[in-house]
Amino acid sequence: MQEHYYKFWREMIKPKGFEVDRDSLRDDYAKFIIRPLERGFGVTLGNSLRRILLSSMMGSAITAVKFEGVLHEFTTIPDVLEDVTDIILNLKEVRFKQYTADSLTLKISKKGPGKVTAADIQTTDKIEVLNPDLPIATLGANANFNAEIVVSFGRGYVPVENRETDLPVGFIGVDALYSPIRKVNYNVSNARVGQRTDYDALTLEVWTDGSLKPEEAVALSSKIMKEQLQIFLTFDETMEPAEEARELGSPTLNENLFRSVDDLELSVRSANCLKNANIRYIGELVVRSEAEMLKTKNFGRKSLNEIKEILGEMGLGLGMKIEGWPPAGWDPSQPPQKRETQQ
């Protein structure tokens, strides 16, 4: 591949990590913010991750059920309010966390009167019910409810007719929705890097059934996408033209470190505080700790929070320990020509 392609590839903005909204974080919900991204990449990544999350995550589901004295689903059980079809629909809503990939057969046995709930499913140490309060059936005084359910581990949605295995005698097949993902939303907004505000910030919200944490789901979906795209890499990613490598100097340093603090577009008060502290470049700023900054004359919490927020959008922060900073021979009054000419 020609050298100018490598140059463009390396100079593209890449996300500096992702933030998790800790205030709303639960075992079944999380909000992630990824920024900055090149313009258009928010929709590209958000839509791709959403589709993979909804279609390709592994989970558990009931795949077959057997009721004592019942031969097919279009019938009823004596002194049970719901018919068999409704009971099966209720069973499909039971969510499990399975600790083995093997199919498991579980039993339900209860006499009336009363309600059968997911808590009545007799589990083992290999599986647990996540929504035990879910109602399954309503029993009359003379009802005797006995059932066996088969719980399997799989991916996506698999209807009965697409399953290859034959059912044991007396079992009724159940369409299986294995996916632990309940809902995925994404939103793209503007992100700022220096003076430019037309970069993307991707907000991704993930709801699960609790059997898989949202952070794990996003990591798995990203891994799947990476492996599916790997086949298109027909060139050596590690190749770097020697001439350009020399021009760039140390490739490990974030280019934003060499930008003027004026590019942060701070309030007048904050900008004057940095000027009084003789901080001219972002690299000189990020190595200062919060405590050091608060000792600066007229520098208060409001200015501190303003700077932290803007640095965070660039993937930087205060109190950073940066290997190789400042670069050998670098004169802040005469920044390298390469740094000045970069967009």
From Swiss-Prot:
Gene3D superfamilies: 5' to 3' exonuclease, C-terminal subdomain, DNA-directed RNA polymerase, insert domain, RNA polymerase, RBP11-like subunit. SUPFAM superfamilies: C-terminal domain of RNA polymerase alpha subunit (SSF47789), Insert subdomain of RNA polymerase alpha subunit (SSF56553), RBP11-like subunits of RNA polymerase (SSF55257). Pfam families: RNA_pol_A_bac, RNA_pol_A_CTD, RNA_pol_L. GO terms for cellular component: cytoplasm; DNA-directed RNA polymerase complex. It catalyses: RNA(n) + a ribonucleoside 5'-triphosphate = RNA(n+1) + diphosphate. GO terms for molecular function: DNA binding; DNA-directed RNA polymerase activity; protein dimerization activity. Residues 1-236 are annotated as: Alpha N-terminal domain (alpha-NTD). This is DNA-directed RNA polymerase subunit alpha. It comes from Bdellovibrio bacteriovorus (strain ATCC 15356 / DSM 50701 / NCIMB 9529 / HD100). The lineage of its organism: Bacteria, Pseudomonadati, Bdellovibrionota, Bdellovibrionia, Bdellovibrionales. The gene is rpoA.
